[in-house]
Amino acid sequence: MAVVWMQQNFQQLIEQLKGTLGKLGARKLIALGLVGAALMGAILYTSIYLGRPSYETLYVGLSRDDVNRMGLALGEAGIPFDVKSDGSSILVPIGKAENARMYLAEKGLPTSNNAGYELFDNMGSLGLTSFMQEITRVRALEGEIARTIQAIRGVKAARVHIVLAEKGSFRRGDQKPSASVVIRAEGGFSAESAQSIRQLVAAAVPSLDASSVTVLDTNGHLLASAGEGANGAALMTASLEQQVASHVDDSIRKALAPYLGLGHFQTSVQAALDTDRRQTKETTYDPESRVERSVRVVRESGDSRNNRNDNATGVEQNIPQEQIQNRNGESSTEKTDRREELTNYEVNSKTVSTVSDGYSIKRLSIAVVIDQARLLQTAGTTPPPANFVDQQITKIRDLVATAAGLNTNRGDVINVTAVNFLDPAGADMEPVSAPWTDTLLRQSGSYANALAILAAVGLLIWFGLRPLLRDQNVKPAGTEVAIREAGEVATPNFIGGAESVGEGVQAVIGGPAAYADQMKTSLSDLRQRMRMPAKLRLEQMIEMDEERVAAVLKQWIHETASGREADPAKASAMPELKAA
């Protein structure tokens, strides 16, 4: 029943709205549509205009000198501007950014002190000496290198100074070039970046060694100095040790987190690395795999005789053609035979050369601190078993040793301790709420949008719906019947078809509830009767109650004759009679 009643009310509302719009006429409908469109446009424009910020960014990442020069230029042009708290961004009112950029570009802003090869664009070739050209070339090279350095993450600004070797006919020794770099670093700058800057500058300048480049920051801290090649290696070693320690620490945390939970343990890892370069050459021979390459055989044989005469020298030896017999002497005979054989073999050999340019872990030192309260919670019983903590520490030590890859032969050390952790600082502190004024200022745009929308809706109701409601609430003429006290004329019951005055009066006197019920049940009949021609409606009224119609006509004639104005509440009882 409730759904049917809602449908009937909705249909009645639609019919009433159609009837009301039909009574307004074409001019009023057009005016109402224009007012609604204007209000919707005003709401949309107000929402967009108040929702965007009052200032927009013009340039970001500017140096202080550029900000000062651009501020002076905008002030001369009469363009309002604002500078952010970091001092590197300029804001202008919305809609003036394009004009401001064009004006600043005309003034050559923003510009930088690091001018590059564009120095040659503004320089004439006539009247320049070789010295001036060389100075300009060095300045341009310094500016280009500084621009490249500023592109590195963590470098806000850079300044480069280069000293090139001077060539001369009367110089005996060769002068080596050198360079210095001053940077303004931010949070993301590291020591490895300083070494990268040295390599960059050395590669950009001919005959410049990286060891001759000095890098420092604006705070006066020396990041890399000339002639410190060993220092660079030490920095690389320290960075490598830090990376290895971080990797081992992550492995330990991944192993302990599922068991103890994050926040219930702390780890510390120290790694000592050996980064010495090693070169090993090893040659291996295989005697089992010999091959006969050549054979050499030498044979020698000999026969020798030796006679010795012991006769004394005299006349007989000096007589010619005289055979002298050896009477006394010694004789010997020697015979030799030698054989030499030489065989050459080819033996397989293997030569291995090993160059180690990496690193090796000399020692690891690991410390693990565990929350004892959390460790006792894992027991599952209260109180925990005896020696429970010691057993758990032993298990955790083995787990950490496996996760970190400890080797006791190289002297690795591990220490696991269970203690009671303190409550984190500020855990019981309540968050400080921001003042309501700050919240109001941050939400001022939203509040302005809401007020604008409410104002637009109010205007729409005042200028659009209010006239419609006023026309709807106007009672149609003839809904009430003027009752004369003397004639005892009651309100006619034209809807229900009452036959006597008493029944009509009783319907009205029955109270608001009875009257509302009667109006609901007869509303459809009344609409049908109102659509009928006036002549037919008048005939039906006369047929229903002739005496009442006659009484009303007599009252009108009497009022017209006396010149007295009729009461609207009484004169509007029978609109059908007036329409007729």
Swiss-Prot record:
Chief localisation class: membrane
Spans traversing the lipid bilayer: 29-49, 445-465
GO cellular component: bacterial-type flagellum basal body, MS ring; plasma membrane
GO BP term (any one): bacterial-type flagellum-dependent cell motility
Keyword presence, NADP: no
Region (Disordered): 273-341
Subcellular locations according to the entry: Cell inner membrane; Bacterial flagellum basal body
Membrane topology classification: Multi-pass membrane protein
Keyword annotations of the record: Bacterial flagellum, Cell inner membrane, Cell membrane, Membrane, Transmembrane, Transmembrane helix
Domain of life the protein comes from: Bacteria
InterPro entries: AMP-bd_C_sf (IPR045851), Flag_M-ring_C (IPR013556), FlgMring_FliF (IPR000067), FliF_N_dom (IPR006182), YscJ/FliF (IPR043427)
Biased composition (Basic and acidic residues): 274-308, 332-341
Record's compositionally biased regions (Polar residues): 309-331
GO molecular function, one term: cytoskeletal motor activity
Gene3D superfamilies: 3.30.300.30
Task performed by this protein: The M ring may be actively involved in energy transduction.
Family under the similarity heading: Belongs to the FliF family.
PANTHER family: FLAGELLAR M-RING PROTEIN (PTHR30046:SF0)
Quaternary state and interactors: The basal body constitutes a major portion of the flagellar organelle and consists of five rings (E,L,P,S, and M) mounted on a central rod. The M ring is integral to the inner membrane of the cell and may be connected to the flagellar rod via the S ring. The S (supramembrane ring) lies just distal to the M ring. The L and P rings lie in the outer membrane and the periplasmic space, respectively.
The protein's name: Flagellar M-ring protein FliF
Organism whose genome encodes this protein: Brucella suis biovar 1 (strain 1330)
Gene assigned in the entry: fliF
